[in-house]
Design a protein with these regions (language model features):
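Non-catalytic, usually N-terminal nucleic-acid engagement modules in DNA/RNA processing proteins
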Residues: 1-45, 49-57
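Extended two-metal-dependent nuclease catalytic cores across DNA- and RNA-processing enzymes
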Residues: 27, 41, 65-236
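Short beta-strand-loop
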Residues: 54-66
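Short acidic, glycine/serine/threonine-rich loops at helix termini
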Residues: 15-16, 58-60, 129-134
């Protein structure tokens, strides 16, 4: 079993209430070992967020509401990240993307190669990935099927993500998004229509902008796309 680890999750869990880098590193090592044992993993890959992120280039306010939490990071936070990458051979810094993107890319590659894997994260955004997931904070193992993952993805496009400062369509939360997609035979077309109904002539632009922020890569540079002719046809029906 290959563990595909969102390293940022273990990193933030490890610095909680820790006074020194050495204490946090010890905690990280403990979390890492316990996680692999919990899912019976024989190997792993792990990603930590690097210094650059295309989403910030697209939308400077992306995750802007997390400024306070960033300011509360210990002075040794970045040194700890570097130490982890140096210590763990299977760990990398991301390049122009986020740990989430690499997790989904690796999971997608495993699916194509028929490699048993488990996604390790507490981030619900990764529920767009089919297969087995493990939440190390709750110690919970669960499985996502293809239909759930697909609907979850399009619900996210409708709602945006207040945690990351992504607007989506205002006043659409989980229940309303579920109702919009409930009887849909084509989630993509239904979402196109919802954006048009709220934003009018600007609907396509808002859909692309939100989609590019929400969409988690399945392969490198796998940016969100919807063809304009598909959108135009969807809003006419």
């Amino acid at each position: 079993m290959l563990a595909i680890i969102d390293g940022d999750v273990l990193l933030y869990m490890s610095i909680w209430n820790m006074d020194t880098k050495e204490e946090a590193k010890e905690k990280f090592n403990e979390l890492f070992t316990n996680t692999l044992e919990s899912v019976f993993a024989t190997d792993y890959v792990m990603a930590l967020g690097g210094p650059d992120n295309f989403r910030v280039d697209l939308f400077p306010d992306y995750k802007g509401n997390r400024a306070k939490s960033k300011s509360n990071r210990p002075d040794w936070f970045l040194d700890l990240k570097s130490d982890i990458v140096d210590q763990y051979e299977g760990c990398i810094f991301t390049s122009n993307c986020e740990a989430d993107d690499m997790v989904r890319i690796w999971a997608n590659e495993c699916t194509k190669a028929n490699i048993n894997n488990v996604v390790i994260s507490v981030d619900k955004d990764l529920d767009c990935i089919t297969g087995v997931h493990y939440n190390p904070r709750k110690g919970e193992l669960y499985e996502i099927d293809k239909e759930y993952a697909n609907k979850f993805y399009w619900k996210q496009i409708l709602m945006g993500d207040p945690t990351d400062n992504i607007p989506g369509i205002p006043k659409i939360g989980p229940k309303k998004a579920e109702n919009i997609l409930k009887d849909s035979e084509d989630y993509m077309a239904t979402v196109c229509k919802a954006y048009y109904d709220f934003y009018g002539k600007e609907g396509y632009s808002y859909l692309l902008a939100n989609g590019r922020l929400i969409h988690i890569w399945r392969e490198i540079e796998d940016h969100f796309k919807i063809k304009k002719d598909f959108y135009d046809k969807a809003i006419e029906e």
